[in-house]
């Protein structure tokens, strides 16, 4: 089969290669990939900022159909429509594993990072990571369950009450999903971007976000102040991984506000104003990926139409058209890009 592989570390080094079709082991299934999403981490990997176990087939956001069962698999059948968590293996013994926080296991191996992922015709997933797709969730939307689960995970680390003002920085796919999840909690939501984010900001309005703001044209601090009688935002979800946005997020928060870092920074060390965090008693939390408890709620949000993921898909390419996908994302033309396998 053909697979899109990160062949070695460094910038670039993506190639479509011929690989043997995988065979499911015990308690594993073989899935024929329908759609697989391009994640921000895939972009970071291509640019050499995000380490993976190269050579490895990338891809971890996907929907598909089970075509083969490994020994001992129960509860799933050939022909089932599924998606899978990104966890391929864990130690199963540490305190994080026993509490269901698989994303924090030091020995965890993830699809598309340490284990071959979904930028291929077939992918192997373990039974424990599988989720049936509800009838009301189409294959394109289902391929975005993983990023939606990530936003659910981040928002679960905060407390959003009806009427709270939530600022989401970064109108990429994660930001647009996070904004919709925040709306589902009853928050009044502002999503921010830059002048080259017009397509994404327009989409934010289409999916019902209260305010979609170009911060190069509008004084966001003044708007937040007007909406909160000078107090500031209750919650900031930083989804861009951009240092200026992170600094702005801290500045926009009210005293005792909540800040969640969701986006990945290109460089791991950044300057942060901890004096503001201290003086305003801001709660700061990091959010890494997702865990099993986030997946069924994410699928319910899709099935109940509280989140519209499909409308975020603007471009589709085959795995052999990576260059086109990359440039569509980097230019700001694309919102969400899905890839399809090739024979």
Swiss-Prot record:
Binds 1 Zn(2+) ion per subunit. NAD(+) binds at residues 174, 200, 262-264. It comes from the Bacteria. Keywords: Metal-binding, NAD, Oxidoreductase, Zinc. Its EC number is 1.1.1.-, 1.1.1.14, 1.1.1.9. Zn(2+) binds at residues 39, 60-61. It catalyses: keto-D-fructose + NADH + H(+) = D-sorbitol + NAD(+); xylitol + NAD(+) = D-xylulose + NADH + H(+); L-iditol + NAD(+) = keto-L-sorbose + NADH + H(+). This is Sorbitol dehydrogenase. It comes from Halalkalibacterium halodurans (strain ATCC BAA-125 / DSM 18197 / FERM 7344 / JCM 9153 / C-125).
